[in-house]
Regions:
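Conserved pre-motif I regulatory segment
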Residues: 9-60, 77
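Conserved segment of the helicase C-terminal RecA-like domain
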Residues: 370-407
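Walker A/P-loop NTP-binding motif
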Residues: 45-57, 68-86, 108-113, 154, ...
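Conserved helicase ATPase core of P-loop NTP-dependent helicases/translocases
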Residues: 133-137, 289-300, 305-343
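A short beta-strand element within the Helicase C-terminal
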Residues: 344-359, 381-385
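Conserved interdomain hinge at the start of the Helicase C-terminal
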Residues: 244-301
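Post-DEXD/H (motif II) to motif III coupling segment of the RecA-like Helicase ATP-binding lobe
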Residues: 162-239
Length: 408
């Protein structure tokens, strides 16, 4: 049985990290101060005030709540408390569903370890990067922390030398666990957990962060968490989900030939209402995303003056995708044409419009996409553009407040 569940009061006054003096290593406190982290978010406060930093926990938290620091800080505290730490082997293993989320976690980790002497190396193992180069760096280096996507870690574990690097684990974190299962990584996760030292024997700390806890995750928890693990939620059970609050509409088109003009009209109308339009347009495939990116890039966006136009799709190289993430996060306006490679773990601020072309692969995907706008009490809107044969999605999901519009 898990320990008592704790629901976080998100309206409570923010607690400063300085309160952790004497509990958190001085080098971690210095790094927090150096990088401008002053107050804990609610989820960070609850995790960091568990009886011990080594306690297993299941945490329900949405993207943008500060959950990355909520698992990195106790994991690093755990690691730095080890006498004669072997820095040549992995002490902390973090698994994430996408390359972009893995990179974000690694970037935060580098900030938190910036005041450590000698330094702790954080390595990343993700698809889309040069396997030979990264594996060689991993084997020759001192990868005290490893952030990986499941597929690439399975690939690494086929090498005896790589498996040896994972024999002294102190902490294993599953971030966006439900997203990893949604992406079909359940078999990979089971293979990974079967190939690293078993929790029952090695005694490593387990942490699982997930917005939802479906039955598939419940089945996997005994491999990651102790029976008496803490359970924390930042999700108010009385809070209406974003999908119930964001205005939603569908624009049916007579044929697929009308999709592009309709999307252009939707964006033009939105731009007329809001010159600082920042929109994500989800496309059916990577090829569609690339095509619309080039079309809108050459026609000046939805309307002059030109909006910045971006693309994010699986055919892009990892450096190009990383550059897009950084640029779209930094801009206050623009259009991002994306395939489903834009996973839930990627947090883009101030999105005021989401456009979905075609039906999502599943109901949850629709919910996740709508949830990219209208965050933190800000105004947002979601639009679908559907061909006649796709209108079944509306009648099959009458619980969504989707208004049916005539074609523009």
């Amino acid at each position: 049985m898990a320990g008592d569940s704790v629901v976080v009061d998100n309206s409570a006054p923010r607690v400063p990290y300085a309160q952790l003096a004497g509990r958190l290593k001085p080098q971690l406190l210095r790094a927090l101060e150096n990088h401008g982290f002053v107050h804990m978010t609610p989820v960070q406060e609850k995790v960091l005030h568990l009886p011990t930093f080594t306690q297993d926990c299941l945490v329900q938290a949405k993207t943008g709540t500060g959950k990355t620091l909520a698992f990195l800080l106790p994991a690093l505290q755990n690691l730095l408390s080890v006498p004669d730490l072997d820095r040549s082997t992995v002490g902390i293993l973090v698994l994430a569903p996408t390359r972009e989320l893995a990179q974000q976690i690694a970037d935060e980790c580098d900030k938190l370890t910036s005041a450590c002497t000698p330094p702790l190396e954080c390595h990343i193992a993700v698809g889309g990067s040069n396997r030979k180069t990264h594996l060689s760096k991993f084997l020759r280096g001192k990868p005290t922390i490893l952030v990986a996507t499941p597929g690439r870690l399975i690939d690494y574990l086929s090498e005896d030398a790589a498996r040896q690097k994972l024999t002294k684990l102190r902490c294993v974190v599953l971030d966006e666990a439900d997203r990893m299962l949604d992406a079909g990584f359940a078999p990979d996760l089971r293979r990974i957990l079967a190939q690293i030292p078993p929790k029952a024997e090695a005694g490593w700390q387990g942490m699982c962060f997930s917005a939802t806890v479906p039955p598939e995750i419940q089945k996997m928890l005994p491999m990651v968490l102790d029976k008496d693990h803490a359970r924390i939620s930042t999700i108010d059970p009385n809070e209406a989900p974003t999908v119930a609050l964001v205005p939603q509409s569908v624009f049916p088109v007579a044929s697929v030939d009308d999709i592009l003009p309709t999307v252009h009209s939707v964006l033009a109308c939105a731009r007329a209402d809001n010159p600082a339009l920042k929109a994500v347009i989800f496309c059916p495939t990577a090829r569609h995303a690339a095509l619309l990116y080039h079309i809108f890039g050459h026609t000046g966006g939805a309307a002059p003056p030109k909006l910045p136009v971006f693309q994010m799709q699986s055919r892009m190289s990892q450096p190009a995708r990383t550059r897009t993430v950084d640029e779209f996060k930094a801009t206050d306006r623009g259009l991002l044409f994306a395939s489903d490679v834009v996973g839930r773990g990627m947090d883009f601020p101030d999105i005021n419009l989401v456009v979905q072309i075609g039906v999502p692969s599943e109901k949850d995907q629709y919910v996740h996409r709508v949830g990219r706008t209208g965050r933190a009490g800000k105004v947002g809107e979601a639009v679908m553009v559907l061909a006649p044969e796709e209108m079944w999605f509306i009648s099959a999901n009458k619980d969504f407040p989707i208004k049916n519009n005539c074609p523009l």
